[in-house]
Amino acid sequence: LIKKIYKLKIPLIGICFGHQVIAEALGGKVEKSSRGWGVGVHRYERKLNPKWSKIVGNYFFGYASHQDQVVIKPKNAFSIYGSSFCPNSILCYDNLENPIAISIQSHPEFKKDCLEMIIKRRIGQTIPNKVGNKALDSLTEKIDNEKIFKPLLGALRVI
């Protein structure tokens, strides 16, 4: 279905699992990170400079909650933002300035309370205590969700 939508040039956006599914469907590779959980507030650095990314800036802080991630991007994808933990955090497809699809590993749709609840439910179970406590401590950082959504949707020409 993703390949069909992509071939029809229908704008497509993927968040977290959607980011991973789009990448795999279009020829990338997703794996569980050898570094474990990426959870809490993470900083992502700009790697390429499409016009729409100037609104976001050279870096942004976003909410992470994942083990799996895109380890090999599809040939038709550009990695716009990444970190040492997650090198392919934002991918755009086909065209740097006017992409058909954009996907993001972090969670611009989350509010602090949502991620805090997820971490607290998983800490000591699926998320190791040390990682979970560090993630909870990171939630005091200011995140940039507001400045992420509009440029992503604008790049897809849906707003």
What are these regions, as identified by a protein language model?
Residues R46-I159:
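Amide-donor transfer/coupling interface in amidating biosynthetic enzymes
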Residues L1-P50:
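Cysteine-nucleophile active-site neighborhood
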